[in-house]
Amino acid sequence: MELKDRIKAARKHAKLTQAQLAQRVGLDQTSISNLEQGKSQGTSYIAQLASACGVSALWLAAGHGEMNSNKEALPGAPSEKDYALIPQYTARGECGDGYFNDHVETTEGLVFKRDWLKRVNSKPENLFVIYADGDSMEPYIFEGDVVLFDTSKTDPQDKQVYVIRRPDGGVSIKRLNQQLTGAWLIRSDNPDKSAYPDEMASESSVHELPIIGRVIWRGGGIG
């Protein structure tokens, strides 16, 4: 079942018209119609839609678990008590020269265990996932890898990897390395420096970098 089908099923479960559901979540009827027809591939209103329809946000966003949030989940099925749904964006984090994102939209999401998030000292409400694009961060991050980042962690720390907004509006994933002089290198892990040269930032100017968040996990396929 796709997102459009789950939204329609949730609305019917709540016995609401498109107009009634739209009014409850602060959208217009056309927006609900576009979602149910698949014309809109994602929405940042998942939590509001789920609440208005009385269904599980985890189910509505990603199809995990039971539709009815009050219904006991099947053994082994993800539950909202144990798992957090982290919003996924259509924007791709460029591991290269910067991928221009003129619009960022939440679409479905990925789930992570709450106890693991607690161990890494991150709160679900501060987290987002994007997909890496390009090879400048190889071998640490490969093209197509999922990247989880924490928007509450924006202070530069030596050898950490960050999602950074570029001056042209693009988003890049880079590692920050502090030098003995106090200056910082904004660098790619790819050793080909002719293709991916390092950038310098002074000790004072590094704090002016538009850091969106620190990468706390990445994952992808094998081979």
Swiss-Prot record:
Residues 18-37 bind DNA. InterPro entries: Cro/C1-type_HTH (IPR001387), Lambda_DNA-bd_dom_sf (IPR010982), LexA-like (IPR039418), LexA/Signal_pep-like_sf (IPR036286), Peptidase_S24_S26A/B/C (IPR015927). The keyword Calcium does not apply. Transmembrane segments: none annotated. The keyword Transcription applies. Gene3D superfamilies: lambda repressor-like DNA-binding domains (1.10.260.40), Umud Fragment, subunit A (2.10.109.10). It comes from the Viruses. PROSITE patterns: HTH_CROC1. Residues 7-60 form the HTH cro/C1-type domain. Keywords: DNA-binding, Repressor, Transcription, Transcription regulation. GO terms for molecular function: DNA binding. PANTHER family: FELS-1 PROPHAGE TRANSCRIPTIONAL REGULATOR, PTHR40661. This is Repressor protein CI. The lineage of its organism: Viruses, Duplodnaviria, Heunggongvirae, Uroviricota, Caudoviricetes. The gene is CI.
